[in-house]
Amino acid sequence: MAPAIDSTVNDLQPNTPNPEKALSSQAQAFVRAYSEDGDSGGQSVLGAEDPLSPLNPRGERFNARAWAKNLAAVTRERGEGFRQVGISFQNVNVFGYGTPTDFQKNVGNVWLALPAMIRQLFAPKGGQTRIDILNHFNGLVRPGEMCVVLGPPGSGCSTFLKTISGHTSGLHVNPDAHFNYQGLSAKEMITAHRGDCIYTAEVDVHFPMLTVGETLTFAARARSQQHLPEGISRNNYCDQLRDVIMAMYGIRHTIHTKVGDDFVRGVSGGERKRVSVAEATLANAPFQCWDNSTRGLDSANAIEFCRTLRLQSEIFGQTCVVSMYQAPQTAYDLFDKVLLIYEGRQIYFGSTSKAKDYFVNLGFECPARQTTPDFLTSITFPAERIPRPDCQPPRTPDEFSQVWKNSLECKALQDEINEYNMEHPINGPDADTFRQLKQASQAQGQKVTSPFTLTYSQQVKLCMWRGWARFKADPWPAVWVMVGNTIMALIMSSLFYNMGQDTNSFYGRSVVLFMAILFNAFSSILEVMTLYAQRPIVEKQSRYAFYHPSAEAYASVLVDMPMKITSTISFNLVFYFMTNLNRAPGNFFFYLLVVFLIVLAMSGVFRFIGSLSRTEQQAMVPASVLMLALLIFTGFVVPVDYMLPWCRWINYVNPVAYGYEALMVNEFHGREFTCSTYIPEYANATSGTGACSVVGATPGNLFWRNVGIIIAMVIFNYLMYFIASEYVTAKKSRGEILVFRRGHTPSIPAKGSGDLEKLESGHATTVLERSDPSMVHKGEGFQGSVSVFHWNNVCYDLEIKGKPRRILDNVDGWIKPGTLTALMGVSGAGKTTLLDCLANRRVGVGIVTGEMLVDGKVCDQSFQRKTGYAQQQDLHLETSTVREALTFSAFLRQPHSIPKADKLTYVEEVIKLLAMQDYADAVVGVIGEGLNVEQRKRLTLGVELVAKPPLLLFVDEPTSGLDSQTSWAVLDLLEKLSKAGQSILCTIHQPSAMLFQRFDRLLFLAEGGKPVYFGEIGNDSSTLIDYFERNGAKPCLPGSNPAEWMLEAVGAAPSISSEGDWPEIWRSSPEYQSVHHELARLKAVDIDQLSADKPDPTSYNEFAAPLWQQLVVVTQRAFLQSWRSPSYIYSKITLCIATSLFIGLVFFNAPLSIQGLQNQMFAIFEVMSIVGQLVDQQMPNFLTQRSLYEVRERPAKTYSWMVFMLSQIVTELPWSTLASVFMWALFYYPIGFHKNAQAAGQGTERGALMWLLFWQFLVWVSTFTHMCISFVDSADDGGNIANFLFVLAFFFCGVLASPSQMPRFWIFLYRASPLSYWVSAVLSTGFANVQVTCTDKEYTAFDPPKGSTCGEYMAEYISRAGGYVKDPQATESCGYCTIKDTNVFLAAVSSDYDTRWRNFGILWVYIGFNIAAALALYWIARMPKGKKRL
């Protein structure tokens, strides 16, 4: 709220509405009493701790107006004031470049968009149409005034708000447009004073794990002024501001409740919306733009929101511009001015009290009971406006615009604007005053040209406070990381437990150090993903000028530091000492320092990648290739001397390589080891005639040089991360355009005007009259209800934090065929919960009691598929078209006995009924690139209608987010359906009087789910009004909205208290007795009819379609979904190609030497490292379809859970097959495996088997992913499980440690690891039965005894140990190679060529296990097991 005394400004200006007139006498008395009693100004601001004080926001008698007036008085007493910003704008034209439609990209046609993308690089506007959005706008909003912006979606409301608030990314404003922000230019306002001119979008993004109190405390501390009265600490003052705002918006009770989101349980949707509003209010901007911020609020809370803005404007002189799609009359009357937009044209700007008369004088009629805002927006709908017969009013947007420009009102507005501009010239005295007052409110040392209140260091401290709060709210991930690290350290170190002090441990020690550096380096890779979740929040708060994005980045690094230290210690302390590395204290702490620096260096790298890329898909491939490069060029997999020249530079820039080198020196420098194996191992061998079988090394001491280099890399990486986080923003939407399947794009002319973000809304807002009304009334093809659904004493109990809580309390009612029943209630009354319980969607969650009967019968297992439930969230598969979504529902939900042709015909009838012909082949898409809000609502209804629900239709919030005319159209549809015999129960938030009148009956709930009324509404709501007035409600005045009046009567708004116990009044009323008599009659009549019923046995089946048909239809849709997700498919294929190609080139043409064989083995080892990335790519796609299935399709009994799981698994097979071809070709041939096969005379068989193994590997990864994600909620949890299991399989596959080297205890893990069999099969297929030729460095050199040749001297040893001598006839400098053929090498890693096909078969068993486990785990963890219904 503006109290945010971040502003210290001049007194209210003469043109500001006088707050004295607005204050009630009671509030003035409060102010005088408590201002005089306060010891100081500061204490009077805080209002003491008296619970009865109207200035105490924690008290029951808190009065917001008194508090605000008191604050204003205290501020003036100190010689200060409040910053104020008005705005005048002249000749504003806004346009953009885009396309009204686009074709849907899929795997096959995505390349067709490449020329356009190239053209865009060189000519950004090429191939795009100029779209005029706003045309010639002029207006003036003075400080302390409120302006409401009205217009249908797509008219330009959002663009107007963004333009005047300076958020014009993707938009173009004409150069000669003039803006005057009370003496400040637009450029200065947008750059230097961004936080004083904010735009609040309608989306709610918050950190879900923070409480409401913490979220709002952060906002208050980020923007509150720095200079306060003596005796008040800044934190106490910010807490006071927070409490005041929470009390104003009625969310004081949620202070300790998590905000939550779609995955984290928290406050309700309406409360979350109020948290967003409260946060923006605490931003304390003197100029505020609110874009449809009342969406999701009931009318009482929407009015309360506007009253709060009115209070800010009156007391503190703040300027508010608000767009509202459904504005209650009471809210409209709180505004000073109104702007009406018609397809991008300004057709009125002026006083709210004169707007109605302006259009009436033009020749339009305002129907009785229609509110002024509804009348004004109806002017923009030809089908809704009512011209008088004796007039010729304007018809087109251009005509309306021209009439406005020629009007006396427009001329008066221009004169007022010119006068304002003369009073407040750009860079005049007002601008200087504003800058001085802003400087006074900023922290010491902050520049006035900075939009931020706090200094950079203060921003970092505040973000650290929030980061620590986030950690405390959810510490378990960090705890599990430490536990997991300790477990992994125990397992991995036990592989090399207590290594000896001899040369046999050399390889083991190098592997141990490699594993340590690898584990620590990549422990931060998940930080790439966490950045995307918080990016929308950081960008929003940066727009509010809370902090620099880089300050949040810096703070997150510091907050994560303790966790990084503890996780590093938890792993390395166990790992270091169990493996018996150098136990000298200095060496241990040096090791700990190096691995910690590597953790920081790689954290900076991954964070930089995440900040640099706009989407997760963009980050995945480069992160994977980077991981691969760092891993290969560490110096272990490929020794430095064996690195190819073209890629040697990677080793120089690799921090992991410097760390590994430092650890190797730290481990071996200055130590002596006993030689374990001499060559030849003869009893009479001397030092001259034998040698130790270990490769030598070059002495050196690179301890601190490498540490210095790593520290420099840490600093550089984090610096790049901070820069990227500051300047790289998330991917922006292209604007709301329709996307069609290629070949189905209709010829839609460009509008030439409209809102770029909502470009196609105008096309979609087709009135329902376009469909043939006779189709519904005649009942042609449409099936209505024939049964009565009734319920009695329904209760719903839930356990929250260990305490029982009743959500619904003895609710009664019925729905009869042909009736439209409204379900209303105060915010949080349990409206959606009641729908869920009645629709049997709360199975397994809480306890439902009471009777729910259909024609006197208890609901059977077919009840859910016989009812339609149009949910508030418009959940649809993004890649499906409208027609496909409807066809899918018809095929699986209509009875199997109905012919396919009849189902398709009915789909077309529903498309006509819902007037969706223009976009029937449009893709659902996402908001911004696909259907708009209204089109999604219609599709949601359509999906339920094509199912032909024989019982009833539940509709949850069908008008949420829609403008009044579109809401009318939706209610028109529901009314037509009810007249055709359909039974409908519909929840609704903000009905106008005319909208409310269209319902037949009302079920009204109070807080706690207690019924307040159930019965007829009556003509002009007479029955309802009579009931409430008869029981003590104040009279409903003529012309007022009965729905709003009813909500106020029961105390729905935070500032309104109910004078009576309405639930108790209802239970004592004769109407309540009549309801129970009718319920008893319905039950008795239905029981009498039971014997006459002869239902079809198939009607009791759980699903309408047989299992085989479900599998075919669902699999087909799942495949289409993947086919139409080219970003996923090409990311998967690109990852496989890039990985194989990179490995193939790094190990290009590997020789058949000892090191060459090791390189080939490690090439196979590196290929397996992409499992984590493939898992991360696949999981989000699965979760998208699972969310749709579990939220909408499973409760509707559309198809079986087993069909869902199997369809997801089958769909991945074609793409795994395709990727395996590229992966095999780019791996098998560059490395040279084909040469090995040809040398062994088995080229065809080995090549084919190698491809089968690669294909099998990708299939295994796919099924492994499904197993890990099937039963958990999020991709993070599934990824952690998959990562843990994969690491075990990865390290125990026999590459890093052969089975003979493993402790006996861990042999079972080697045998249990599926990768053991895959690696064995690939190794043996890759280079079995081939001769080995050692390089010069690989020969062990020694001299034979005098008189002997090398061959003679080594004959006995070779017969026992194998190998060969380089030159058997030599008499000196014998060169001995320990391996003669590749089979010896394979035997050392327990790989046998004869078991290749056996291993191939065993891996299929693992794949089968993955599938079975995925099905079992899904059923156990996610399928409701029973009905908690009594």
Curated annotation (Swiss-Prot):
<dbReference type="GO" id="GO:0005886">
    <property type="term" value="C:plasma membrane"/>
</dbReference>
<dbReference type="InterPro" id="IPR003593">
    <property type="entry name" value="AAA+_ATPase"/>
</dbReference>
<dbReference type="InterPro" id="IPR027417">
    <property type="entry name" value="P-loop_NTPase"/>
</dbReference>
<dbReference type="InterPro" id="IPR034003">
    <property type="entry name" value="ABCG_PDR_2"/>
</dbReference>
<dbReference type="Pfam" id="PF01061">
    <property type="entry name" value="ABC2_membrane"/>
</dbReference>
<feature type="domain" description="ABC transporter 1">
    <location>
        <begin position="112"/>
        <end position="368"/>
    </location>
</feature>
<dbReference type="GO" id="GO:0140359">
    <property type="term" value="F:ABC-type transporter activity"/>
</dbReference>
<keyword id="KW-0812">Transmembrane</keyword>
<feature type="transmembrane region" description="Helical">
    <location>
        <begin position="707"/>
        <end position="727"/>
    </location>
</feature>
<dbReference type="Pfam" id="PF06422">
    <property type="entry name" value="PDR_CDR"/>
</dbReference>
<feature type="transmembrane region" description="Helical">
    <location>
        <begin position="1278"/>
        <end position="1298"/>
    </location>
</feature>
<feature type="domain" description="ABC transporter 2">
    <location>
        <begin position="789"/>
        <end position="1032"/>
    </location>
</feature>
<feature type="transmembrane region" description="Helical">
    <location>
        <begin position="620"/>
        <end position="640"/>
    </location>
</feature>
<feature type="transmembrane region" description="Helical">
    <location>
        <begin position="1249"/>
        <end position="1269"/>
    </location>
</feature>
<comment type="similarity">
    <text>Belongs to the ABC transporter superfamily. ABCG family. PDR (TC 3.A.1.205) subfamily.</text>
</comment>
<dbReference type="Pfam" id="PF14510">
    <property type="entry name" value="ABC_trans_N"/>
</dbReference>
<keyword id="KW-1003">Cell membrane</keyword>
<keyword id="KW-0677">Repeat</keyword>
<feature type="transmembrane region" description="Helical">
    <location>
        <begin position="511"/>
        <end position="531"/>
    </location>
</feature>
<feature type="transmembrane region" description="Helical">
    <location>
        <begin position="586"/>
        <end position="606"/>
    </location>
</feature>
<comment type="function">
    <text>ABC transporter; part of the gene cluster that mediates the biosynthesis of eupenifeldin, a bistropolone meroterpenoid that acts as an antitumor agent.</text>
</comment>
<feature type="transmembrane region" description="Helical">
    <location>
        <begin position="1213"/>
        <end position="1233"/>
    </location>
</feature>
<feature type="region of interest" description="Disordered">
    <location>
        <begin position="1"/>
        <end position="26"/>
    </location>
</feature>
<feature type="transmembrane region" description="Helical">
    <location>
        <begin position="1400"/>
        <end position="1420"/>
    </location>
</feature>
<feature type="transmembrane region" description="Helical">
    <location>
        <begin position="557"/>
        <end position="577"/>
    </location>
</feature>
<dbReference type="InterPro" id="IPR003439">
    <property type="entry name" value="ABC_transporter-like_ATP-bd"/>
</dbReference>
<feature type="transmembrane region" description="Helical">
    <location>
        <begin position="476"/>
        <end position="496"/>
    </location>
</feature>
<keyword id="KW-1133">Transmembrane helix</keyword>
<dbReference type="InterPro" id="IPR013525">
    <property type="entry name" value="ABC2_TM"/>
</dbReference>
<keyword id="KW-0325">Glycoprotein</keyword>
<dbReference type="Pfam" id="PF00005">
    <property type="entry name" value="ABC_tran"/>
</dbReference>
<dbReference type="Pfam" id="PF19055">
    <property type="entry name" value="ABC2_membrane_7"/>
</dbReference>
<feature type="glycosylation site" description="N-linked (GlcNAc...) asparagine">
    <location>
        <position position="684"/>
    </location>
</feature>
<dbReference type="InterPro" id="IPR029481">
    <property type="entry name" value="ABC_trans_N"/>
</dbReference>
<keyword id="KW-0813">Transport</keyword>
<feature type="binding site">
    <location>
        <begin position="825"/>
        <end position="832"/>
    </location>
    <ligand>
        <name>ATP</name>
    </ligand>
</feature>
<feature type="transmembrane region" description="Helical">
    <location>
        <begin position="1305"/>
        <end position="1325"/>
    </location>
</feature>
<keyword id="KW-0547">Nucleotide-binding</keyword>
<feature type="transmembrane region" description="Helical">
    <location>
        <begin position="1133"/>
        <end position="1153"/>
    </location>
</feature>
<keyword id="KW-0472">Membrane</keyword>
<dbReference type="InterPro" id="IPR010929">
    <property type="entry name" value="PDR_CDR_ABC"/>
</dbReference>
<keyword id="KW-0067">ATP-binding</keyword>
